[in-house]
Amino acid sequence: MPAPRAPGLRGGLARARRTLPSPAATPFAFGYALLLLATSLYADYGDPDTVDALLQGSSTDVAHLSTAPVPTIFASALWIAGGIASPYAVVFIFVLAALERRIGGWRTAGVFLLGHVVATLATEIPVALSVLAGHLPESSLHRLDYGISFGLMATVGALTGLLAPLFRWTTLAVVAVLLVDDLLDMVEPLAAWGHPIALLVGLACWPAVRRVGPGASRG
């Protein structure tokens, strides 16, 4: 009689659950995921005029960054461009939790925020300068730009520094192909340039995250 497979199945399910955020193991990723779920559901089912006003107010365009930079930076990271079904949302859940397990919640939040801020400023400051120089119209100061993708790319970059070499370089190769494809298409120029900048921010965090390393105390 063949041996029962239930224990193996249970072990597989347990391993799968460990990759997801949880309030005990990864409180930052878990709480942030719930927050993004709430804002995504509201974006889908809330009053359209109110949703539009909130998204406009959360946009990290030059107009908002020049008048209220800090609130705008944080507000823009409360929404997922494309909603909860976006590929960014799916990858976000696993990547953020994986990094938090290795370096703790506060450090993970710092990596995410650093990538979000640096890539945003690196793409918006040239827009402002181009408008001042007369190379772009003033309408370029007002755009709808929000989401978690810059922070996510920085998190991916930092996480790869803690992976085994095979997984590290395979992941970076796949991400590089996707980023080059975006640069060639140039559907969203600022996002296309911002994503590799954010990834480089994450790669620059390798020395810091490696000093902490897997198994470090949370915080």
Located regions from the model:
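N-terminal signal-anchor transmembrane alpha helix
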Residues: 11-56
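N-terminal TM1-TM2 helical hairpin plus the immediately adjacent luminal interfacial "cap"
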Residues: 44-98, 105
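Membrane-helix interface "capping/anchor" motifs
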Residues: 100-108, 158-171
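Hydrophobic alpha-helical transmembrane segments of integral membrane proteins
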Residues: 105-135, 199, 203
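Membrane-interface micro-motifs in multi-pass membrane enzymes
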Residues: 139-159, 194
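Loop-to-transmembrane alpha-helix initiation sites
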Residues: 187-202
